[in-house]
A protein has these predicted regions:
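Middle-to-C-terminal accessory/interaction subdomains
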Residues: 1-199
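Secondary-structure capping and domain/repeat boundary segments
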Residues: 185-233
């Protein structure tokens, strides 16, 4: 607990035990969806059997998210600050539950990787259009069965339209607020568009993204180096 994660040796040591990218993706997901039945609850780790298997987080039980428990106000909650709270209550974010994330953020490599992967998500699955379209697709696929649920569980199912709209509002507005919280927490500035182009014979990988087309544009911070790789066919 006294190790300084800014020390490369300490960070390398813990990186041998946990899958760092998995830990980053897990925290980004929980923070973005505003799951407030976490991080002091619903936590599980797993690892592959055999030597060298690193511990990974498991994402599950996320129904305390997307604004549903908070009557539609979740999209403007600063869940990043919530996830690093040093003196939280016994539930849902006590100090022990935020400790690992807080310590890892002491390391500049982890910080930069966290910020860049968050930007990757802002540029892809966390766009408002993507989330609203996904929501509408799911809602449409089950809307015909809703009357059956309303007949069987009238008290819980009659608010179908209201709750779908809560999730739609969250999908529409969350990225705007979450980007502001990210910028404030890490003192980020100079968000800019970055264009990437590949020639026939290969693809490019930007951080965690491999675009399907040979041209792609995303938004990143000029003060955080990004990782670009050429991948031959």
């Amino acid at each position: 607990s006294q190790s300084n994660m800014a020390d490369p040796a300490a960070y390398d040591s813990i990186s041998k035990w946990i899958d760092v990218d998995n830990h980053i993706n897990y925290n980004i997901a929980q923070i973005f969806i505003d799951n407030r039945d976490w991080p002091g609850n619903n936590i599980k780790f797993w690892r592959p059997q055999g030597n060298g298997g690193k511990r990974r987080r498991m994402l599950y039980d996320t129904d305390f998210s997307f604004g549903i428990p908070w009557m539609g106000l979740g999209y403007n909650f600063n869940t990043l600050q919530f996830a690093v709270e040093e003196n939280g209550p016994d539930w849902p974010n006590p100090p022990w539950s935020t400790f690992l994330f807080r310590k890892l953020l002491e390391n500049s490599n982890y910080q930069q990787r966290f910020i860049n992967i968050f930007c990757d998500r802002f540029n892809t699955i966390f766009t408002s259009d993507n989330m609203v379209n996904r929501l509408d697709s799911i809602a449409t696929s089950i809307v015909d069965i809703i009357p059956v649920h309303q007949n069987k569980w009238p008290q819980s199912a009659n608010n179908w339209d209201y709750n779908v709209q809560i999730v739609r509002d969250f999908a529409q507005f969350r990225s705007e607020y979450m980007r502001e919280y990210l910028e404030s927490f890490f003192n980020l500035s100079n968000l800019t568009e970055a264009g990437f182009y590949s020639t026939p014979g290969g693809k490019i990988k930007i951080n965690t993204i491999v675009p399907e087309s040979n041209s792609w544009i995303g938004e990143y911070y000029t003060d955080i180096p990004i990782r670009v790789e050429a991948i031959p066919d």
